[in-house]
Amino acid sequence: MNNRDYFPDLIGQHAVKKKLSFYLEAFHKTEMCPFLNLIGAKGLGKTEFAKAFAKNLINKDGDKRSFLELNCSTIKNNEQFFEQIFMPLVADNEITILFDECHALPLDLTMAFLTIFNTEKNSRKNFEWNEATFEFNFKKQTFIFATTESDKMFPPLKDRLTTIDFEPYSSEELGEIIKLCTPDVTFADGVIQEIAQTVRNNARSAVKRAKEINLYCGAKEKNTFDELDFIDLSDHVGILPFGISYTEKQILSTLKEGSCTLTGLSAKLGLSKTAVQRDHELYLLNKNLMEIDGKRKITSQGLELCKFFA
């Protein structure tokens, strides 16, 4: 195996890079690639890595393989997939298909995929449906799946795929992403680290922060960015410590007054219990700003943060 860097423009995810690089090397020798399943939280770069992986797949004639990205929530049933997607775009073509948010695949197509991807040594698979035969050629067609909710995937389908797990980014990696996305900006010492502390652990959040910095520098007609600039930007766009949202700030302020049940917290915030649990509590728990022990409670770190808001 050579040491070629197939992902020079992507930061972090070293285990993912090693695994995908191995499969690319194998593909270049065998023309075969396993059915990949990219799993991780929102914003960790699953789609970007899938696109970068696909760019490195070369057809027999030396051209880059075509790439098709599908959001599985838009696929309604077998009929739509085979008649509107597979036959005109996939059949007999050299192409890579990304099934994004694959936990949302319709049930009948999931059942079809159980048959289609139930193969080990063969490079072809014929699938019969609705009195027609559809040929899958796995030397021509590469299939990649991605999801943020692997627990909702049909287990037998998940077993047929090769899992690639993504992990949260470190503050240093988030800082590197911000610098990569702000090539015309020179940062004062220590500012990147301070900015990275306000990014919510994922690459997408870092890219958004970089866009805000680019807009700020463009509006100010400057190409340097220091601590005072970051304070000014934070004031204008509402950047809070740890990158928490104003709703999360409200949760901490509520819990500062005393522990609370989920129902009580939901009522005080005017949000559904599901919204509180899925959209706001998770990040506060991740940052150890609150805890759940029967009731919702603020931690000592959360109390320290509330002093900053006072």
Model region roles, listed by residue range:
Residues 2-39:
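Pre-Walker A (pre-P-loop) alpha-helix and adjacent loop at the N terminus of AAA/AAA+ ATPase modules
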Residues 193-197, 204-219, 252, 282:
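C-terminal helical "lid" of AAA+/P-loop NTPase domains
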